[in-house]
């Protein structure tokens, strides 16, 4: 592909910590090494306010002037819209008005989140999201299960875009615990849509660690004083939490994939999770498949999994392969 200038349009960017940011932070350096120039249109470039339930998520407004200038100054060869917020819709509007082709990606099940918090029917929210993707040449989706879900809501031009994992950073060699106590670890947002309380209330004689921040953090700290809440961790520190865990517990039923599952597996840590979108798409090898509708039973299964099998499973899931797929799906404007 000869194109050199890629415009990424996103409502999710640093300092946010989420799967969207992780994915693109991982692929951008590889794209740049291949000779592509990358520019990102993101919330910090606009006037914005914090999302009511999540202070770290910014809602942009008065987007037209800055969006128009971004496109006119940069003149991208490729446009990819990463999210369905105000910035994403501003990018879509510019592309349509100027007859530019674009691709997009679907990362987050906002309809499920909004239904849990505001009781708005999923069908209504999906209709709004579908509008952004309706003119997209290709809609990149992180899992087969999520692709099938979106088909039910009449999304078109869907393709599966597989994720990678940094197997150098997330590595069993980071394990440095001498503790004889079994350790169950959760990494992610501390929020009701992550179903985290199913993990917190598990009746087990094991140590539980929660890595992450979120709107329910203080409530759960007060409610579960016996659990170790350590806040957000990144880099080497995060890698140690994964590697030192005996089981990584992923209680969410609303994820589109779950990058954290891949990071835990690369660290040699088996997964306890429900048989839902995300986990069922990742844990396809019977040696590491511990899925169960009973989370405690899944934990028990995970404790029997060989750590080396978890690690070996991830060795083929490289970010280079992820970038190759990404470029195959891109289109010239």
Task: Enumerate the language-model features and the residues they cover.
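Acidic anion/phosphate-binding donor-loop and adjacent secondary structure
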Residues: 165-182, 219
């Amino acid at each position: 592909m000869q194109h050199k200038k890629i415009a990424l349009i996103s409502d999710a960017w640093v300092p946010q910590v989420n799967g969207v940011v992780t994915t693109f932070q991982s692929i951008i350096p590889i794209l740049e090494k291949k000779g592509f120039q990358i520019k990102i249109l993101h919330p910090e470039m606009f006037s914005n306010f914090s999302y009511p339930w999540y202070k770290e998520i910014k809602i942009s407004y008065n987007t037209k002037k800055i969006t128009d200038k971004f496109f006119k100054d940069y003149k991208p060869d490729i446009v990819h819209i990463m999210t369905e917020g105000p910035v994403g819709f501003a990018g879509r509007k510019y592309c349509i008005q100027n007859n530019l082709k674009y691709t997009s990606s679907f990362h987050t099940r906002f309809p499920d989140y909004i239904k849990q918090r505001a009781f708005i029917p999923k069908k209504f929210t999906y209709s709004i999201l579908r509008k952004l993707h309706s003119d997209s040449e290709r809609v990149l989706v992180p899992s087969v299960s999520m692709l099938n879900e979106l088909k039910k809501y009449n999304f078109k031009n869907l393709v599966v875009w597989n994720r990678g994992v940094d197997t150098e950073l997330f590595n069993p060699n980071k394990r440095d615990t001498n503790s004889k106590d079994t350790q169950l670890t959760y990494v992610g947002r501390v929020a009701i849509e992550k179903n985290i309380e199913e993990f917190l209330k598990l009746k087990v004689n094991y140590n539980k660690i929660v890595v992450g921040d979120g709107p329910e953090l203080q409530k759960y700290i007060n409610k579960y004083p016996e659990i170790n809440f350590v806040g957000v961790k990144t880099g080497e520190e995060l890698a140690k939490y994964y590697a030192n865990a005996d089981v990584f517990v992923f209680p969410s039923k609303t994820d589109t994939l779950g990058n954290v599952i891949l990071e835990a597996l690369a660290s040699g840590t088996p997964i306890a999770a429900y048989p839902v979108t995300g986990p069922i798409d990742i844990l396809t090898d019977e040696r590491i498949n511990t899925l169960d509708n009973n989370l405690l039973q899944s934990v028990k299964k995970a404790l029997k999994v060989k750590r080396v099998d978890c690690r070996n499973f991830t060795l083929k899931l490289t970010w280079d392969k992820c970038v190759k797929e990404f470029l195959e799906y891109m289109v010239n404007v």
